[in-house]
């Protein structure tokens, strides 16, 4: 069966996530990249910045109306938080049937948008045209908490450490290797956007304390969970194994996963299940690549599901 080529454009392509998106699109047999928008790189060949893409397309500096005028079948918005609305409004007006996937926080609380964490929200992708990609930490938190959600006796406490690519490309203390050297930088220790996101999605309060580390990519999340009743390690491990048995991107491991082993990989590792005396407090560790499963890979899963393709197409 011949599958018709679907056109796609990326807005905000200079960033780390944009680069990963270009690689995935280049590997996709059914997608044709028709525009890549970046003010800073306008006029330069995409292939000069991304070896995975070898065609002649050049970066363009496109405002919202120019993006809408391209009339692509799919548009992925990889913009900093607070910048998506003009693009969405222009697409809504010009080509409402365009599939829009937004990677920012801007629409994660909007009930008109589908919240796309496939392993937990796979049920109703068909026909969706507006999909909000979860946050990187929010993805790790939800996947770690969900198998024990019905057993919680109080708010999970989540201690997160991310590589500095999570702070984007705009210079700041949180992506300055000199300031991060031999350092761990805490920030937004209460009311972080991902804390609110996870609390809203799971329907329980969650406490989250993020930190930035000197490595470039990858998240380690250590989650402390209090349980209503004692459970054995085997019972807890079985909950994770059964919940994610059919999820190829989620690997349940025995020991606590290392962030160095997940960097550059598309999936999530969850493990290191450790019980405190009394078996009513458990600690679980998750790792994922913030640029991949925390952003670009998840966007590609969402795209594939919304268009009725195999979920892992282009995800090697």
Swiss-Prot record:
SMART domains named among the record's database cross-references: Semialdhyde_dh
Pathway field: Amino-acid biosynthesis; L-arginine biosynthesis; N(2)-acetyl-L-ornithine from L-glutamate: step 3/4
EC number per UniProt: 1.2.1.38
Main location: cytoplasm
Superkingdom field: Bacteria
Keywords: Amino-acid biosynthesis, Arginine biosynthesis, Cytoplasm, NADP, Oxidoreductase
Pfam families the UniProt entry points to: Semialdhyde_dh, Semialdhyde_dhC_1
GO molecular function: N-acetyl-gamma-glutamyl-phosphate reductase activity; NAD binding; NADP+ binding
Top EC class, one word: oxidoreductase
Swiss-Prot/TrEMBL catalytic activity: N-acetyl-L-glutamate 5-semialdehyde + phosphate + NADP(+) = N-acetyl-L-glutamyl 5-phosphate + NADPH + H(+)
GO biological process, one term: L-arginine biosynthetic process
Transmembrane segments: none
Active site, per annotation: 136
Cellular component annotations (GO), alphabetically ordered: cytoplasm
Location relative to the cell: Cytoplasm
UniProt record similarity statement: Belongs to the NAGSA dehydrogenase family. Type 1 subfamily.
Stated role: Catalyzes the NADPH-dependent reduction of N-acetyl-5-glutamyl phosphate to yield N-acetyl-L-glutamate 5-semialdehyde.
Name under which the protein is recorded: N-acetyl-gamma-glutamyl-phosphate reductase
């Amino acid at each position: 069966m011949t599958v018709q080529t679907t056109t796609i454009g990326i807005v905000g392509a200079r960033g780390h996530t944009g680069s990963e998106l270009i690689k995935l699109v280049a590997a996709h047999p059914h997608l044709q990249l028709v525009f890549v928008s970046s003010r800073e790189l306008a006029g330069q060949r995409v292939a000069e910045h991304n070896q995975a893409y070898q065609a002649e397309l050049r970066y363009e500096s496109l405002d919202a109306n120019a993006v809408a005028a391209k009339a692509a079948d799919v548009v992925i918005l990889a913009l900093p938080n607070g910048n998506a609305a003009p693009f969405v409004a222009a697409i809504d007006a010009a080509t409402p049937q365009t599939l829009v996937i937004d990677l920012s926080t801007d629409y994660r609380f909007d009930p008109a948008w589908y919240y796309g964490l496939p392993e937990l929200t796979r049920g109703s992708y068909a026909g969706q045209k507006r999909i909000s990609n979860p946050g990187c930490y929010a993805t790790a938190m939800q996947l770690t908490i969900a198998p024990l959600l019905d057993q919680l006796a109080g708010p999970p406490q989540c201690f997160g450490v991310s590589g500095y690519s999570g702070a984007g490309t705009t210079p700041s203390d949180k992506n300055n290797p000199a300031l991060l050297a031999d350092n761990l930088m805490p920030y937004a220790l209460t009311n972080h956007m991902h804390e609110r996101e996870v609390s809203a999605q799971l329907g329980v309060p969650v406490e989250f304390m993020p930190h930035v580390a000197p490595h470039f990519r990858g998240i380690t999340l250590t989650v402390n969970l209090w349980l209503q009743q004692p459970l054995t390690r085997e019972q807890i491990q079985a909950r994770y194994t059964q919940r994610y048995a059919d999820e190829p991107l989620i690997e349940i491991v025995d020991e606590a996963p290392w962030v160095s082993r997940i960097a550059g990989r598309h999936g999530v590792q969850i493990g290191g299940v450790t019980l405190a005396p009394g078996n009513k407090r458990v600690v679980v560790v998750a790792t994922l690549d913030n640029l991949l499963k925390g952003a670009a890979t998840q966007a590609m899963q969402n795209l594939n599901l919304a268009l009725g393709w195999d979920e892992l197409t282009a995800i090697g």
